Amino acid sequence: MSISITHTMITAQDILQFKTHKVSLQESKNCMYNGSPFQVYKQMSSKKKGARFEGIVQEYCTNLGYNVTKPDNSDHDRKINGIKVEIKGSMLWSGRQTHFRWQQLRPAQDYDVVVFLAIFPQQIEFYGASKQDVKDNLEVQDEKGNWIHNQHGGLKVNSGTFFLDSDGLTIPTWFKPMQEVLS
């Protein structure tokens, strides 16, 4: 590898010779969202993605005739027909064509329902769950006492923040159509 290394930078030309960069380029070329109208979201930071997903839910629900308003506090994202709604979106994970992971689910926060977006390359599916269903299905321990959906701090301590995985082919049985939890 013939590059000019300095202590403060790698040039745009030099990065092209790094194995890590080559792997990243290949993964980018193989992204299942390439050419999809949803590709733009795949390229966003998590924070920006979350804000855009909230906007999508707001516009979608408004178009369906729901009354969407600002939240009462930072524990939920919107109020839809007076219901406090937390919004969580997931795109298929790189290299795993059927894997969704919704993150930062906190049953102790002030919301009534969670709206889950499952963003496929050609469609967005909207699901919902009550706060109680989230708690009952995520705030659980296995037979060894491990918090199996715990997002932070390992499996031994309940961090209060959970994740949910789905293979994308079988959405969790406790999910309901979004309209059902908003009525």
Where in this protein do the model-derived segments appear?
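Nucleic-acid endonuclease domains
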Residues: 1-81, 88-183
